[in-house]
Amino acid sequence: MIAIVDGGATKCDWVLLQENGKEILLKTQTIGLNPNIIAHDKIANEIEKNPELIKIKNDLKNIYFYGAGCGFDENKKIVKSEIQKVFPNAEISVQEDLTAAAYAAYQGTPAIVCILGTGSNSCLFDGETLHRELPSLGHMLGDEGSGSAIGKAVVRDFFMKKLPKDLADEFEQAYQLSAAQLIQKIYHSPMANSYLASFNKFVAERKNHPYLQNLVFQEMKRFFEYHILPYKNCFSCEINFVGSISYIYQDILKSVASYYRLNVGTIVQKPIENLVKYHQKYILK
């Protein structure tokens, strides 16, 4: 049995296949297993909370895990070690989520590939190798254009009294949140990035409001400036996007691309299905 796992910051999608890779046997989820966010010694425990995975833990022979926070070798080793505790008989490959995005959006030609979900990232994928210009610095210093960045922007504008009255009243009614509660959640609780990203729901439900359209537009501009324009060939190749934020705000995303005279290619909401197809075509053949 083979497992292919797409691990975002908030959740991991698991797909289990027959050993020949042709038939899907199970689809399930765990929480996100980002080693920069979750305590390392809790990774195995979180996997073990899924009864479907525990039931087949001795039957898995290969696990292809692609995870947020797995861009550094040290983090790859940590995640691999924790997964191995749960699946002792499996041969495990751990790669960063950007690799999964590149595979999921691959159309047979070189392209810039971007993640816009809870967090954000980018690379150039030539069909064989990922080429990165810049690191991903996480929600504290980076993640421009992401769900956490959009959530942070709308929360900040609410507390700093920048939101128009209609939006401020709706935000107040929806969350009844004090500054003290916000600070506690962000600075003294785990998964602050996911907490900030949860406010994106407020924006997405009102994305046609002019103020929020501009808020998202500015966040997307920041993403392009930090994560796309540094690639010298960004004007000559397609730019593919993976993740819920790129899907929800695709009209605004395309407007920003047009502003910079760039060409948007594929937009993939959930990469797991395309990731499985990529493995079946190129890796498990």
Protein language model annotation of sequence segments:
Residues 35, 69, 136-143, 262-266:
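A short glycine/serine-rich beta->alpha loop
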Residues 64-71:
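Polybasic, low-complexity association/targeting segments
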Residues 8, 15, 68, 99, ...:
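Anionic group-transfer/hydrolysis microenvironments
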Residues 71-166:
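Phosphate-binding/catalytic loop of phosphoryl-transfer enzymes
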Residues 1-63, 82, 105-112, 155-285:
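ATP-binding/phosphotransfer module of carbohydrate and carboxylate kinases, centering on a glycine-rich
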